[in-house]
Amino acid sequence: MEDYKQRIKNKLNVVPMEPGCYLMKDRNDQVIYVGKAKKLRNRLRSYFTGAHDAKTTRLVGEIRRFEFIVTSSETESLLLELNLIKQYQPRYNILLKDDKSYPFIKITKEKYPRLLVTRTVKQGTGKYFGPYPNAYSAQETKKLLDRIYPYRKCDKMPDKLCLYYHIGQCLGPCVYDVDLSKYAQMTKEITDFLNGEDKTILKSLEERMLTASESLDFERAKEYRDLIQHIQNLTNKQKIMSSDKTIRDVFGYSVDKGWMCIQVFFIRQGNMIKRDTTMIPLQQTEEEEFYTFIGQFYSLNQHILPKEVHVPRNLDKEMIQSVVDTKIVQPARGPKKDMVDLAAHNAKVSLNNKFELISRDESRTIKAIEELGTQMGIQTPIRIEAFDNSNIQGVDPVSAMVTFVDGKPDKKNYRKYKIKTVKGPDDYKSMREVVRRRYSRVLNEGLPLPDLIIVDGGKGHMNGVIDVLQNELGLDIPVAGLQKNDKHQTSELLYGASAEIVPLKKNSQAFYLLHRIQDEVHRFAITFHRQTRQKTGLKSILDDIDGIGNKRKTLLLRSFGSIKKMKEATLEDFKNIGIPENVAKNLHEQLHK
C-alpha cells in the first residue's frame, strides 16, 4: 500500500513549474479527476499536503498515480482540460453533460418544416428558440402555433392525408403540391413570434376575427378572440428585465466554504425566461473553475450560444473568449452591470440556503457508505450499481439497474433491459445476461466501474454475477445480495464467498441506504415491466383484428396512442386517418365488444 505513496512522492519532485493539465487515476487505472494549473508542481503538491474538505480528502484517498501534460499557456491548458474531461468523464469533475436539459422549440430544416419541442440541440438541423422555463410552457406555445398555422405534423410523410389535414391543421404536403412561398411566409411569422415579435400574429388574428364576425361565424370569431387572449397572457407572464431585446446569457457567482455557486440568467427579448444554478466544490481557484464551467456549458448540445455573454469584470476576458465563440461583455456600470450583480447576489443566496441542507445530506449519505464499506471490509463504495429482475411467469421478462453515487440516486445513469437470451422464468440466467451486457459495454466504452454491485437476491444470484464478472470479463468488483423477509421488506445484506450476513444495525444509516436502493431498483424494474406489458397488450389486441397489419397498427398507435383513445374514436375518425371503411367498421366493433 505504501509503494504507491512513495511513487507519487518521487514523481512530484520531477513535475515542472509550468502550466498544464493533470490526470488523477485510481487503483483500476481509471481517470477520476482532471485539473489544470498555472504551476503544475505547486498544484499537485497541494493535494498531498495539508488538510482538505471531505470531497477532496476522498479524492486524494483514491489516487494511486497521476499523469501530467505541460502546455505553452494557461489558455491552452483550459482547452486541453475541457477535451480531457469530455474524453474521460471523471466522476470527481463537475460533469454537466446530462445533468440538465432545457426545452426548446425547433423549426426543422426540411422542404416542408415541422414544429417540435425538443431538449436536444443538433446544429444544422433547424432553428431553435428558447430555452423555455419548463416543458409545459414550450408545449403550450407549440399548441398555440399549431392552432394558428397549418404546419406539417407527421414525422415521416404518410401515403394518405392524415387527421390533421381534415381538421385544418395541415396543408397536406404529403399529397398536394403546397406553395413553398406560402409555407415560407408561415415560417417567417412563426419565427417572428418566437423571437418576441407578436404584433404580426396578433394583427393577423384580429383580421380573421373581424372577417368571421362579419360573416356571422361567431363561433370561429370567439376562437380567434381566445387565441388573441392566450398570446397576450403568454407574453405578459414573463418578467421584463430590459427594453433591449438582444439574446444574452448573464453569469454571476459566489464562493464560500470551499463551494462555488454559479447562476445563469437566460435573457430573451428583454425577459428573464429561465435561470440555471450550479453548485461546484472548489478543486481549483474560483477563476479557473469558472473558465472550466463556462467552457463545458457551451460545448454541450442543450445550450445555444447567445448573441452576448455577460460576466463579472474580475475574470479574464481572453480566457473566456478562447472557449466561448460569441461576444463577451463585462459591464462596468448601468443596468447591465446591475444584472451581473443580481446574478451574483442570487448565487450567494442559493449558496447560503443550500449549506445546511448539503451539510446534513452529505454527513448522512457519506456516513452511510463509509459504514457500509467498513462493515463489508471493502473500500468506501462511492459508486453503487444495483440490479433487479421483473416478470410474470416468464412473460415479458425485464431487468433494471439503478446507480447511487455518494449514497444518492444518480438517475441519469439508470438503465433498463429487456431479457433477450433467456426463455421462461429463470431469474439466475436473466441476471447473468444483464450483468454481462452492462459491463461488456462499460469496458468497451471506457465508462466508470462501480465500487460495489448489489443484486436483489441471495447466494445463487451473487455466484452467477461473480462468475460472469471474473471468468468472462476479467473484473474484480465486490458483489453483494439483498434479501427480503416474508413481508417483502429489506432484511439482510449478504457478502463474501459463502454469502454471509453483513452485521448491520437496522437503525443504521447504512441499512437505511440499502433499503432505499432496494426499493428504488424494485420500483424502477416494476414500472418498466408494467410499461412493457401495456405495449405488448396493446399490440396483441390489434393483432387479432382482421385488416390491421403492421402499417395500420403503426398508424393507429401514432394517431391515437392508446386503446382507451381508440374506443372513444368514431368510425369517421378511423376513416379520416386512412383506414378503409370495412376495416374501420371491424375495428370499431372489436373495440366495443
UniProtKB/Swiss-Prot annotation:
Keywords for this protein: Cytoplasm, DNA damage, DNA excision, DNA repair, Excision nuclease, SOS response
Single biological process term from Gene Ontology: DNA damage response
Compartment annotation: Cytoplasm
SMART domains for this protein: GIYc (SM00465)
PROSITE patterns listed in its UniProt record: GIY_YIG, UVR, UVRC
Highest taxon above the source species: Bacteria
InterPro entries with a match to the protein in the record: GIY-YIG_endonuc (IPR000305), GIY-YIG_endonuc_sf (IPR035901), GIY-YIG_UvrC_Cho (IPR047296), RuvA_2-like (IPR010994), UVR_dom (IPR001943), UVR_dom_sf (IPR036876), UvrABC_protein_C (IPR050066), UvrC (IPR004791)
GO molecular function ontology, one term from the record: excinuclease ABC activity
UVR domain sequence ranges: 199-234
Domain (GIY-YIG): residue spans on this chain: 17-94
Record's keyword annotation contains DNA repair: yes
Alphabetized SUPFAM superfamilies for the sequence: C-terminal UvrC-binding domain of UvrB, GIY-YIG endonuclease, RuvA domain 2-like
GO CC terms of this entry: cytoplasm; excinuclease repair complex
Protein family: Belongs to the UvrC family.
Subunit composition and interactions: Interacts with UvrB in an incision complex.
Function: The UvrABC repair system catalyzes the recognition and processing of DNA lesions. UvrC both incises the 5' and 3' sides of the lesion. The N-terminal half is responsible for the 3' incision and the C-terminal half is responsible for the 5' incision.
Name of the featured protein: UvrABC system protein C
